[in-house]
């Protein structure tokens, strides 16, 4: 009985986290696992830390909705990546392929289809991203996080499973988080996350308010690669990280409130941990608008406050943080009533049912 699976997904941490949640569970069930990603994406760094999962890099190009000279050469990179993925899948002979999206996943899903191997795509956002839109016709099943997404998917392919949250996030230890950051017990903690690539506007507005905010909060700031500010390195009550992985559960456990972008994976993790959140979604100028839809959905459900990037100023950020903290108990009560089912188990069952025997 062939129980081999190839995972794919990359470009941002959000396109890898579901795979990281799946891997330990798949191992428990006796699956042989491999990963196809890009040569230099964040997925390579994250998966390289996972024991027993060989990584196969392929060529990939970004598919854009706007004019860029790279639009003329990137399709050839995608074509090259498709041939590479086809050969890898032909050699590895998986019984199923699972994709979390991102541009590297398009060649892999097409490569699986060319080999007659079933594939499953997981779409986190309310509206499918461009990569998943291209890959969907070649996939066997498409899992969605938001029920609203089903209207964008063929009825016979779409399955609503909810959000997949990593089990280790639920095992965070607040005391370990405080030790890591040299924070004291009793003073509220604000966790700031600008996404795996960081956010200059959020970083700048936060640091402009640090002197005031540190009177009332301890702040752990995940600011993105190359964005640590040496001016604040030794400031008491303020801890900066470029990026965190193993430490994240402990940092989340000690946080009282969260300031974040509105990527679907992250906000559902905050929901699972009952962390009141202030969301600053990427603007439509900088994205396709998916984070705005995610944020508005959470705002409507009473899980989050939303500050649009075009309204982001030093003053508006400071006021929103204090307002969130003052109303944190109401947000937690709303989260307690949320319907957060076991999406991970649903996904594992679907993988087992869809695989090629």
Curated annotation (Swiss-Prot):
Gene Ontology BP term (one): lipid glycosylation
Name by which UniProt lists this protein: UDP-N-acetylglucosamine--N-acetylmuramyl-(pentapeptide) pyrophosphoryl-undecaprenol N-acetylglucosamine transferase
Enzyme class: transferase
Gene3D superfamilies attached to this UniProt entry: Glycogen Phosphorylase B
Family stated for the protein in its record: Belongs to the glycosyltransferase 28 family. MurG subfamily.
Pfam families noted in UniProt: Glyco_tran_28_C, Glyco_transf_28
Source species: Geobacillus sp. (strain WCH70)
Catalysed reactions, semicolon-separated: di-trans,octa-cis-undecaprenyl diphospho-N-acetyl-alpha-D-muramoyl-L-alanyl-D-glutamyl-meso-2,6-diaminopimeloyl-D-alanyl-D-alanine + UDP-N-acetyl-alpha-D-glucosamine = di-trans,octa-cis-undecaprenyl diphospho-[N-acetyl-alpha-D-glucosaminyl-(1->4)]-N-acetyl-alpha-D-muramoyl-L-alanyl-D-glutamyl-meso-2,6-diaminopimeloyl-D-alanyl-D-alanine + UDP + H(+)
């Amino acid at each position: 009985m062939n129980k081999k699976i190839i995972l794919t997904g990359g470009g941002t941490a959000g396109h890898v986290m579901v795979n990281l949640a799946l891997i330990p569970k798949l191992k428990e069930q006796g699956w042989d696992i491999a990963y196809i990603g890009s040569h230099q994406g964040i997925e390579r760094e994250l998966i390289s830390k996972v024991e027993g999962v060989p990584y196969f890099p392929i060529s990939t190009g970004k598919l854009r909705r706007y004019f860029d000279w790279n639009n003329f050469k990137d399709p050839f990179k995608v074509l090259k990546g498709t041939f590479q993925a086809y050969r890898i899948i032909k050699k590895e002979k998986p019984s199923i392929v699972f994709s979390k999206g991102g541009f590297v996943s398009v060649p892999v899903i097409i490569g699986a289809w060319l080999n007659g191997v079933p594939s499953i795509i997981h779409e986190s956002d309310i509206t499918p991203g461009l990569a998943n839109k291209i890959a969907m016709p070649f996939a066997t099943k498409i899992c969605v996080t938001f029920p609203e997404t089903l209207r964008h998917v063929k009825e016979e392919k779409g399955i609503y499973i909810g959000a997949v949250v990593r089990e280790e996030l639920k095992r965070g230890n607040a005391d370990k988080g405080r030790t890591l950051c040299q924070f004291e017990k009793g003073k509220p903690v604000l966790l700031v996350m600008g996404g795996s690539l960081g956010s200059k506007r959020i970083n700048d507005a936060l640091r402009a308010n640090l002197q005031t905010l540190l009177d009332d909060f301890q702040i752990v700031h995940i600011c993105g690669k190359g964005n640590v500010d040496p001016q604040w390195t030794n400031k008491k009550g303020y801890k900066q990280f470029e990026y965190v992985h193993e430490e994240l559960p402990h940092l989340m456990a000690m946080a009282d409130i969260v300031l974040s972008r509105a990527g679907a994976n992250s906000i559902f993790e905050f929901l699972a941990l009952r962390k009141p959140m202030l969301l600053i979604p990427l603007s439509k100028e900088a994205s396709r608008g998916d984070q705005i839809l995610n944020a508005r959905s959470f705002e409507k459900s009473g899980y989050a406050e939303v500050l649009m990037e075009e309204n982001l100023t030093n003053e508006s950020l400071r006021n929103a943080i204090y307002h969130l903290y003052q109303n944190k108990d109401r947000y937690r009560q709303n989260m307690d009533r949320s319907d957060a089912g076991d999406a991970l188990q649903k996904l594992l069952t679907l993988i087992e049912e869809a695989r090629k025997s």
